[in-house]
Amino acid sequence: LDPEDGFDPHPWSARLSKGTAGLSRDEKRRALAAYFGLCTFVDEQIGRVLGALESAGLGGDTRVLYTSDHGESAGSRGMWGKSVLYEEACQIPMIIAGNHVPAAKVCATPVSLVDAYPAILDAAGPQAGGADLPGQSLFQIAAAADDPARLVFSEYHAMRSPSGAYMVRQGGYKYISYVGFGAELFDLENDPEETCNLAADPAHASIRADLEAELGAILDTHATDAHAKADQKALVERHGGPDAVMARAAGGKNFTEVPPEILAEL
């Protein structure tokens, strides 16, 4: 899915990806090779952690959660990095193992990172609380029967996004709502690469309406987008305004520095 080969990206994604185009095919191949190398490196480090647990005699009663916060577009749709709600960016690796976790099971229940925090509390024991959280423990989900129709939600408001983007996925369908832009609806079972937008297809109108209702039950997209942008504007102003923030980023300090009192203890 490359714009250079005629692929036409969604207008929201096209605006988001400005500045990432222009790589030659050789540069793209080298970038992919580097990414795969990083994946191998991370896998090796996870192996070291698991090996250390076994060597310490802790492998049998330690629960392990291996995951990430996002995927990687890796050139798909002409994009690199994260920030979009297509499968290549929002689908993440997630492997759990340990005490009371079914071995060699592939779970077909959709989950999201809101399920990770309850899982950590679950592993810590019932005294940790968390009963009122929106997610469900991954360990409980893994031990239960599969629920492919479970609904999951994601949103994005951050770097380079022209407006808020919201996604709900249920069963074989994914619905993406963009504030100020047209929506997208995909049949993931028959179109896993998300190339055919069904949002305007009359035959799928009821599915779109159902998923829009599910999204609306979670939040008001326009109000949430306005709130996020107001918070972002206030944060920029607290740090001296756009010019000051950009100058700091250009100087290599596009992060929050460690407080001096913490550095003194290191």
Label each residue range with its predicted role.
Residues 70-76, 114-117, 122-188, 193, ...:
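C-terminal cap/loop subdomain of S1 sulfatases and analogous C-terminal strand-loop tails that border
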Residues 36-39, 43, 47-50, 54, ...:
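Non-transmembrane alpha-helical segments in soluble domains
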Residues 7, 11-27, 200-266:
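Long, internal low-complexity/basic segments
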Residues 77, 198-201:
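Residue-level signal for well-ordered alpha-helical positions
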Residues 1-61, 65-110, 123-126, 130, ...:
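Active-site-proximal cap/lid insertion segments
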Residues 3-7, 42, 60, 154, ...:
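Intrinsic disorder/low-complexity signal
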Residues 102-105, 193-197:
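Short small-residue beta-strand/loop micro-motif enriched in glycine and branched aliphatics
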